[in-house]
Amino acid sequence: MKNPRKINLIVVHCSATRVNQDFPVEALEACHKARGFHSIGYHYYITKDGVVYPCRPETEVGAHARHYNAHSIGICYEGGLDEKGKPADTRTPAQKESLEDLLYSLALDYPDAEILGHRD
């Protein structure tokens, strides 16, 4: 099904959790609901074991990048902080592979979309 939303951004986020902390999709959902969202704000979540969880349908506006949600797809991977809580690339090989596969698929669906990180 073609997405009625005009997608020009694919935004990659991290959960901002420590490398030694488990943050399963259920914890992410509870966190987002506590913030007042009706569901997880991202369209996809990738856990440390590389499992990709579809969260919001791509046809639905996400809640992940203020002012950009209407025209973007949001992906989040579990982690992003080292053991001391400092920003770090904590992606596991499984996460990297899953993220690459997901981005490839989304780039086919949205060839004009720019892929960037949340801080970009």
Q: Could you describe each region identified by the protein language model?
A:
Residues 116-120:
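Short, highly charged C-terminal tails/helix-capping segments
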Residues 1-114:
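Active-site-adjacent loop/helix surface patches within enzyme catalytic domains
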